[in-house]
Amino acid sequence: MNRTVIVTGGSRGIGYSVAAGFAAAGDRVLITGRHREPVEAAAAALGPSVMAAVCDASDPAEVEALQAALPATVDVLVNNAGGNTDFDRPEARDLKELAASWRVNLDANLLSAVLMTAAVDPRLASGGTVISIGSIAADKGAGAYGAAKAGLASWNAGLAAELGPRDLTANVIAPGYIERTEFFRGRLTDRRRDNLITATANGRPGTPEDIAGTVLFLASPAARHITGQVIAVNGGAWTTR
């Protein structure tokens, strides 16, 4: 389709599949990641239409530095960077550590989207879209991670109102359990996995391609009247009305 697309956290999992989908559609894609080797390897594997940039989307200085590498116009921004940072930290032993663990999760999952969107905003082309990856945890609860993803949904509602007059849309996709990602950092037990699948209506885990397909739809002309929404993609594990 010859669009220009940015996908944060594009070196693996959902972000990689999203970038692959846009590349297959004929779009130019810039993927970002915190570490040079994996993001550059991902771009090389995805093909010549995909470029890589090293950036921690939660770090204002790194996002500021990234702006020099951004294309002049952007049609699609996918805020995918994030994840439950509690898996990377020991349990808090006091209030200082508790505050730090919450701030890290909020930075990774909410502030990263806010910063990237602010950086890209002047480049967003009319008819474009901002799509952020939320989580079922925003509704079912998961401590700091769930709170951060709930905040993402609330922020998106205001963002949609701001961008609407410029013919831009903004939506959140809230995945449930998605296999073939590193979300659980190897800590997912067989019993927990079975319970997550049993909770679905269709009896299967989600895949990165399920989320990528939803992203591509929201970025398509068919979705131009969808904005300010949270789209649940969880196999019926959590239903909305």
State the predicted function of each range:
Residues 164, 169, 226-228:
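Short, small/polar-rich loop/turn modules that mediate ligand/substrate recognition or access, typified
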Residues 216, 227-241:
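Short C-terminal tail/terminal secondary-structure segment
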Residues 54-65, 210:
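The beta1-alpha1 cofactor-binding region of Rossmann-like NAD(H)/NADP(H)-dependent oxidoreductases
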Residues 83-103, 144, 184-188:
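Conserved mid-core segment of classical short-chain dehydrogenase/reductases
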Residues 95-101, 129-165, 177-178:
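Catalytic loop of short-chain dehydrogenase/reductase
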Residues 91, 165, 178-200, 240-241:
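A glycine/serine/threonine-rich, flexible loop-to-helix segment
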Residues 11-13:
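Conserved glycine-rich cofactor-binding loop
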